[in-house]
């Protein structure tokens, strides 16, 4: 079984339409991962901003949070997602990720979260931007911009602790995992009055 793109009434493309099919519930995890691999030609034809959306929508991206570190989780998703592999090959990948991160509104995301509130696109973007595969491509201005945006998002998430508990410091945690940096700290505990 292969993944397929379908068009909805509002003309937005759903790249992982297979997850809504009757076959999905009958598949093993290996078959599901295989079904979520989009054809190379389709990936090549996407502009980078669209490709970022496809990466964020990857049904198994959530698995990144099931590992001891965000780095280990990222590497698993990278190994399994041809869309993420394609994103790494784009010259404008960092610009697209930074732009998406900057324009993702914490309040809007919080308002649309379901019970799976930890699984918003914010933490996905934060994990991606903190990985050396992307951060090593950044110039000094981009690094400064990412940290400025991260600080802004962190403060906004901290103002909604009931929604973002456990994921307020994903960016800083991810940076610290592979850099050994201690300049930026994150709270790994909840403070109560």
Where are these regions (language model features)?
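Non-catalytic all-alpha helical scaffold/repeat segments
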Residues: 20-23, 27-193
């Amino acid at each position: 079984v292969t993944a397929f793109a379908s068009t909805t009434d509002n003309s937005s493309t759903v790249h992982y339409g297979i997850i809504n099919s009757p076959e999905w519930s009958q598949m093993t995890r290996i078959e599901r991962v295989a079904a979520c691999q989009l054809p190379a030609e389709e990936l090549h034809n996407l502009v980078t901003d669209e490709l970022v959306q496809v990466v964020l929508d990857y049904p198994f991206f959530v698995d990144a949070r099931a590992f001891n570190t965000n780095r280990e989780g990222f590497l698993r998703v990278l190994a399994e997602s041809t869309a993420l592999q394609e994103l790494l090959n784009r010259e404008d990948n960092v610009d697209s990720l930074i732009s998406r991160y900057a324009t993702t509104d914490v309040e809007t995301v919080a308002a649309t979260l379901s019970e799976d509130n930890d699984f918003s696109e914010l933490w996905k973007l934060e994990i991606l931007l903190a990985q050396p595969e992307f951060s090593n491509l950044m110039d000094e201005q981009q690094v400064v911009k990412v940290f400025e945006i991260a600080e802004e998002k962190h403060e906004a998430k901290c103002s909604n602790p009931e929604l973002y508990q456990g994921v307020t410091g994903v960016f800083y945690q991810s940076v610290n995992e592979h850099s050994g940096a201690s300049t930026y700290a994150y709270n790994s505990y909840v403070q109560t009055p």
